[in-house]
Regions:
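Amphipathic alpha-helical scaffolding segments
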Residues: 2-4, 75-79, 160-164
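C-terminal, well-structured subdomains that either form a transmembrane helix-short loop-helix hairpin
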Residues: 221-232
Length: 335
């Protein structure tokens, strides 16, 4: 449905006995899907039992995995595993890891001396089913949901431990309805390529969507993965043809979007037809749409985003997403 191609496989046939992993690729995006095998690797099994399907690892490509680990742990990060070298006939790769919110981890990947398909332990996976790409280019950002009063803790972590800066802040006056609210801070690295928004619940009359996530995921974790496209209308059209369902956007959203956003290149009627949101920052505008949760638990979902100059995020779309998820909460009886 999302147009990814088969890339690599690790499992019994490749000498890996405790898990099976499939790697799929689309342009610069690599996703690894892993399931445990019977045996000694209880970490994967325990993660799935506790959280359901979700994001365990956010991998970061670095020039020096040993230095990245030494620097972050010296600044207070808790180690997930120390630097180690893995190699096969295609070269060597250095990896290290640190723990972040909940049971999520960052793994630092140094692959300058590796020329294989993916990494040691994996072999090329050739599938008979390779659907047409839908135009996804790269991961634009990944959003964390953390617990009460934890947003500033993780802002400080990314700032002081990882060297990130705060790009923009949304408070409970920006993102709220008559029932619920949230607060969010967006952290970004030096070149702006990596963006990690961090959400926490805010006081409201009813249970917010962040609280719902924390209940069903059983703790903090990745709320959604935003993937970029150069043609959001084409991408969304193909996804809908393949059965992907998106969050409903009330038609009234489009009554005022022109006044708020100004002139754009896209046909507003087509955007309304597909439920694509539009917002603007000081540098341009962006278009966004959000899938429904990927599993029965109302946790992880995807965002499709197209940036037309905008480097940050607009408050209008964030609020519209918040309201759409709140409507789904009401349907589920968890508001």
């Amino acid at each position: 449905a999302l147009g990814f191609q088969s890339m690599a496989y690790a499992g019994l046939e490749t000498g890996v006995t405790d898990r099976t992993s499939y790697v799929v690729v689309q342009d610069k995006i690599r996703l690894v899907f892993t399931t445990p095998m019977p045996g000694e690797n209880n970490e994967i099994f325990d993660h799935i039992k506790k959280h359901g399907d979700g994001v365990k690892v956010i991998a970061l490509w670095v020039d020096d995995a040993k230095k990245a680990w030494e620097e972050t742990t010296s600044r207070g990060a808790e180690s997930y595993f120390e630097p180690r070298t893995e190699e096969d006939k295609d070269g060597k790769m250095v990896k290290s890891g640190i723990k972040i919110y909940g049971d999520t981890v960052h793994i630092f990947i140094e692959r300058k001396n590796y020329n294989g398909t993916f990494m040691p332990g994996f072999e090329k996976w050739e599938s008979h089913y390779n659907p047409e790409s839908i135009g996804l280019k790269y991961i634009d950002h990944m959003v964390a949901n953390v617990g009460w009063n934890e947003m500033n803790i993780w802002e400080k972590f990314y700032n002081e431990t990882m060297g990130f800066a705060n790009l923009i802040t949304f408070d409970d006056k920006d993102i709220s309805t008559q029932y619920t609210a949230l607060m969010s801070k967006v952290m970004t690295n030096g070149n702006g390529r990596i963006k990690f928004p961090i959400n926490e619940p805010a006081e409201g009359k009813k249970k917010s969507q962040i609280e719902e996530y924390l209940d069903f995921y059983d703790g903090p974790g990745v709320q959604h993965i935003a993937v970029a496209t150069d043609d959001i209308v084409r991408t969304v059209s193909l996804m809908k043809e393949r059965g992907v369902e998106f969050l409903y956007v009330p038609g009234t959203y489009y009554d005022t979007v022109g006044d708020r956003v100004g002139e754009i290149a896209e046909d507003m009627a087509i955007l309304k037809k597909h439920g694509i949101l539009v917002d603007r920052d000081d540098e341009g505008y962006l278009l966004q749409i959000f899938t429904k949760p990927l599993t029965d638990r109302p946790t992880l979902f995807f965002e499709i985003i197209q940036r037309k100059g905008a480097q940050s995020f607009g408050k209008g779309n964030f609020k519209a997403l918040f309201e759409s998820i709140e409507a789904e909460q009401e349907r589920r009886g968890t508001l």
